[in-house]
Every structure is written in C-alpha cells, then in structure tokens.
Amino acid sequence: MGTARFLSAVLLLSVLLMVTFPALLSAEYHDGRVDICSLPPDSGDCLRFFEMWYFDGTTCTKFVYGGYGGNDNRFPTEKACMKRCAKA
C-alpha cells in the first residue's frame, strides 16, 4: 500500500507541474514578480460554477471559475479587473 500511495503522490505532483509550469512560462514578470494580468484564464480544480472575469491582454472577459485553485488573473467584477489590469 505504501508504494501505491507514493506513486499516486508522484503522479499528482507531475500533473500539477505540467499544468502550472507552462502558465508560469507564459506570464510576464515585473521586478521579479509575476504580472497576474498576463496569466491565462484558469478555471481551477473544482466543478462549481462562478462567473468571474480575467484580463486577456486587451480587455476583461467573463469565464467560469470552479471555486478552487486557478491563478490570480481572476476578478469578481469587470470593474475590479479593469482597475487592476487596464493600462491608462
């Protein structure tokens, strides 16, 4: 049972890295920090249905968020998204 549990943990870690690493590579960095507005939309890991907003590089667009996980390019309103991400 210990080997199966270990292999499950390794598989889970591998999947998480495959999902997270490309998103980090596509993000822009400013002062060594990730610019959250450049991250791709990420619906997260759960199956709930929350209408949220993400910045697509030009404007804020609706998407469905599952309620857990995802990244920080996620805002409760279009106004909050534009305030954080739109360049004046």
UniProtKB/Swiss-Prot annotation:
InterPro entries: Kunitz_BPTI (IPR002223), Kunitz_BPTI_sf (IPR036880), TFPI/VKTCI-like (IPR050098). Expressed by the venom gland. Residues 1-27 form the signal peptide. One of its GO terms (cellular component) is extracellular space. Its main location: secreted. Residues 37-85 form the BPTI/Kunitz inhibitor domain. Residues 28-33 form a propeptide. The record marks 47-48 as: Reactive bond for chymotrypsin. The keyword Ligase does not apply. Disulfide bonds join 37-85, 60-81. Belongs to the venom Kunitz-type family. 03 (sub-Kunitz) subfamily. Serine protease inhibitor that inhibits trypsin at a molar ratio of 1:1. PANTHER family: KUNITZ-TYPE PROTEASE INHIBITOR-RELATED, TISSUE FACTOR PATHWAY INHIBITOR. This is Kunitz-type U15-theraphotoxin-Hs1c. The lineage of its organism: Eukaryota, Metazoa, Ecdysozoa, Arthropoda, Chelicerata.
